[in-house]
């Protein structure tokens, strides 16, 4: 860091001669006065430049501190109406400081605002007044003193604080809209103004939040803002959308008032209006209504309202075009009759509506500070005229407009030109004194928002009064910081205080504290929107390179899946230069991406995770959440679990407690199933079972209605005289029933059938659905059947073709071919082939319409396939209109076709049987015809083995797939 020190001395003498009869600002007496003033100025200038290494991080950053000590010797003689002369000598010593900063562009705006706020709060009672003088030197000196500010180090507490955030939550919707559209002109906004506007919109975005958009960003607020600004093009809105835009901003207005406002607003040939004109006109109108209702003797009728509205609209539009406060008062747009009243209203608006006569002297500066608008003409105090009225006017809105229409470097001079000088005052001597509010006229009740604002203002004034010294106690400083809008954690405050110098009494030096605070807080704010800045850099002349398009979206916090991005890029035209119009791309994305539609809601997964993080949940919300997760928790199981948990008075339960109960219930159910299998094995006596125990045996192995099955079995001829039943014969009889035979045949073909992949099914569906007048080429037909793994023999295929009319183009009617193929033995036996072929005929957009599929199967008299389909899709969640994705469909079909393979070892096979509603059919012991495993083991050995391995066994029994539980690989059979 480089430091340069410059010392210089300057001396000047001013002679100020006031003739008899001239008006003095201190008295109305005529006098002759000769003033002799001698100035000796010692100045020290310190210039600090940051080293090149640091400069790379903070470019163009330089501070210049100038401290001046002025010794002023004054000799004054006066002659009052010929009486004796009075002479007076005085010596004044004053200290001035001037600080110049060359700062990076991204900090320039906040620095200028803070400097203006500091200047407006730093006026001291003994500062110089500017007098007319005959000496050119004095004029030059006055200008120099205008640019300087008195040393007031304690006010630099607010240097690094973004004061635009203060009280943003306490603004009404209309005032928020005014602040937003004061920053936005022609649809554009300065990057430096983005944090303030996003704060008002309650959109919190940082670099970390950009990376974790779906987890932390306030998407609702972003979408609300998006809905508002998507209708605004170049700062203009269609007249038909004005009401909707205002309503979405939360600005209450009836259509009659809006129509009246629109009448006095410029409408272009496209029936578009400037939304800023509408909002500012409404704000002016509202303030005038409040003035009229509070000021005594000012009734308001419809005629006055209409005239006043015209006056407001005309006044605002004229004021907007000039972009600065004119020295002349605006003329009325309706009639001369309202001239006086319009001038009074306008003057009151310019003087800050809630200024009262008994406010502290610095209230005006504080209100400007809170509003985020300041003035740079600190060194000038306008004199008061005879009637005591201060004609110094400032317009917050004028400065806001001006800051947007001119470069940032000109803001200081622009703000200075907005204050009326003495020549301006002399040009309007007949201006009437504006109406001043009287405390006795404040009859209406103050709203809670106003009370909060007043309380906050009082706290702020109290904090300012305490910051009048260069040193302050650390505890007191920490207590008043929140009143100034600086919220620090205890750790942050202690860290800053530790790095701050103190005096012998242990009090903190404010200037040092402010510098430490600036270092602590400035850099994170500079990195508030790095992603947005990167995205803006990629946009050149409204176009983005095609390869940078997805990265640009991600910098804005928009993450699209690959299919979504591909779909949108296909709908967007790229020029010869491989560039895409970014606005057109966004419009295409908004209209063609489901997640950005007007019905935007958070993804179900995000909502579910958010709900599950809550400590307590209502019973209804818990059931809906678990249902959306497809948790396979049945309603009776859910109700049973509720009986075991604590439900409070608000019908809420602890989620962790509920989850623990459900886990215990599931473990108990699995153990119970295992115990039932063990009990079934205990009922066996070798390979025989007593008839009286047959019902319990079937119930334990999972048959839902064992009584009916037992009655059928006991009537069979394989029951012995002592009412004993051979378990092999019992199982064979059970398999011969219709519902068992259909299921077992279906499972048998699974061992020889290779299921097609999802992409193959889509390909087959695409071939079979795109036919010309019902005709399909034979090569395409063969390819579609091959994709479905339909193992038709060549003889069956040719036989089906021979029964159909084949054209010269080798095309065949698809319906005729399918009818003939239905008669083939392979198709009749293969239920899986029936389901797959029917699925391809109704598959659309990767969705299977379950109702249409069942109807098609029934129309083709494929009742068994329809029954299997019903069981297969029993627990599959359906989308809208009763549709299921093809991925879920094939997963369930694969699950139901899975069958274990034999490995030459003893296995207990638990096969999931859909026809018997979730229960397991257990094939065990001795030889079973056509079974996978042939095993012969004694009852004692079986019981010992199954008990030994029950822990590993119960983890498999209730799965939807057919699973294998290994018992003893070394058993001898």
Curated annotation (Swiss-Prot):
Listed name of the protein: EF-hand calcium-binding domain-containing protein 13
Biased composition regions of type Basic and acidic residues, renumbered to the chain: 396-405
Low complexity bias spans: 406-418
Matches recorded under InterPro entries: EF-hand-dom_pair
Domain of life: Eukaryota
Residue segments, region Disordered: 384-448
UniProt domain EF-hand: residue ranges: 488-523, 524-559, 633-668, 756-791, 792-827, 864-899
Keyword line: Calcium, Repeat
